[in-house]
UniProtKB/Swiss-Prot annotation:
HAMAP family: Phosphoglyc_kinase
Name listed for the protein in its UniProt record: Phosphoglycerate kinase
Binding site for substrate: D21, L22, N23, R36, H59, Q60, G61, R62, R116, R156
The EC number(s) this enzyme carries: 2.7.2.3
Binding residues for ATP: E331, G357, G358, D359, T360
GO cellular component, one term: cytosol
Pathway: Carbohydrate degradation; glycolysis; pyruvate from D-glyceraldehyde 3-phosphate: step 2/5
Disulphide-bridged cysteine pairs: none
Gene name of the encoded protein: pgk
Broad enzyme group: transferase
Matching SUPFAM superfamilies: Phosphoglycerate kinase
Amino acid sequence: MMTFQTLDDLDDGQRVLVRLDLNSPVEDGTVQDNRRFDRHAETVKELADRGFEVAVLAHQGRPGRDDFVSLDQHADILADHIDRDVDFVDETYGPQAIHDIADLDSGDVLVLENTRMCDDELPEEDPEVKAQTEFVKTLAGEFDAYINDAYSAAHRSHASLVGFPLVMDAYAGRVMETEYEANTAIAEKEFDGQVTMVVGGTKATDVIDVMTHLDEKVDDFLLGGIAGTVPAAAGHPVGYDIDDANLYDEQWEANSEKIESMLEDHRDQITLAVDLAYEDENDDRAEQAVDDIDEKRLSYLDVGSETLMEYSPIIRESEAVFGEGRAGMFEDERFSVGTAGVLEAIADTDCFSVVGGGDTSRAIEMYGMEEDEFGHVSIAGGAYIRALTRAQLVGVEVLQR
């Protein structure tokens, strides 16, 4: 049940500060258009059409990484999505930014510079600390209201996400509203029939958290091929990381007792891959039965065809299906079989379905599916996991105060 104010509670024509999550892939310095712009455009366009003066906050990448770039390209992409001019200023709360904010007229949209270029944005600290930063105090006085639409970043206690609701009127944008409602449904909704969850990705802690918290709700957990630590607990020596970083070894060492205990307690609810795919000496996709893996010597990058044949009817016969993360390295078409196949099976059903994780919407777009074939497609990653496990989302909590 939502307990925060939404755009329906906001009087038209005010000057508003809107936090979006436009964090995007960057290839050779070029920001890639993606579904996040589609989603957030709904909020921004509604506000502009209602005569609000709109200033946008967003982040991109992390300091020191190749994707840590300015938001000037984001402003251009957003303009295409809302079909109106969007201005950009290369400051977040400096004198030029304040000047441009003061010059906003009804229906104008201004994108401020990358929040993570501000010293006050990082690291994560209590909301009360972030509310007292120069960043928050400077901008708060320039606006009538703050709107958080960045559900996918709601697990982060950063200044632009948690500071403003403590010092000014705060509202949820349309993405925040719909994502929160859909992603909490699994914990609140009751089902009479089979409930299935497809769990992918490479983070053992995410797999553990999801399965531990949802074991009474979910009848069958189907595991993706690169969640390699769980097959290891079942006695199959799978998995080097694709960059030879021994990701599985490190995660196994840190979480082996929890994984073994989880597998022992919930073995009848867990369906493991029966075959896995790897790159052979000719750079082609090859598959191997899990039972035939007797030593750890390969990087397995996807579930195999037999696994997909086993998983698909389980999905299609379910009353509800939830998906989290990838089944394989779908960016490489050779290893897209698992991720694309699972998503196609979910799309083919009429059941209640929610799919999410940081890469899911990208996979849907890459392989020609439409979001309306699913009950809900979450653009969130970490926040989606936390919602499924009923963990605190600090960005939502401050809106509810």
